[in-house]
């Protein structure tokens, strides 16, 4: 009699999980220990395991709690979220998956790998799965492994599908794993990481110190806005100087309504250029240019070498 009751109980339990796995709100549990509460409306998984949702998300964690009525999944401890369909992986300690809203809230610190190329380290991020957008209002570090570029951003929104990055208070280090690199500071910007184009406001670009053959220099650009696409970078209302930053008033500078670096034509052009010495205007040029970085000798007033950078333009 006891064996018969045990067999009936096992059959009922198996049927429950089979029906649940193939329901409209399918979640398949594969955990070491499971608890079913509130008439089957709450499921708790313990002692490590994996769940797979019907929309292709695989989550591994130490503990799970699923509220079937609210369609909310909680996970804690050594979490890995793998969305194979959309090509991203997230590691964290605490997540809340609001399935009806298609929203995954990652609480605390986390790391994310997108397209096996973009490595995000952030805190309190949100994944909007229906829009494929990653958001965070906390400082975030992004490493673009392909282009060897480091981004540090105070606030961001990243389109996983389009590889479009929007951010505020942005620091960029190009070729970050090399001894010398260029540094960029943008108040806010939008980047297309696919083709390395961007538009930005309130820019401050610090070129590597030895770019003109003198490590004591601090060559830099400032401008109210900048954009870059298809090998052409522009800076609006820009200022250029290579004087040391410790000089409160730079001994010299070039100001222009527009500065254009055209990689295709191998030229750097200035519109309405004003040369200043100790902040005193001394010479004005409606048009002013010098050869680009790939040109060693050419007629012109200046022959600089601009660092090899996908942000400003590759030399």
Question: Model-found features: residue ranges?
Answer:
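Classical Sec-dependent N-terminal signal peptides that target proteins to the secretory pathway
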Residues: 2-24
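Structural signature for solvent-exposed beta-strand/loop edge elements and short helix-capping sites
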Residues: 21-315
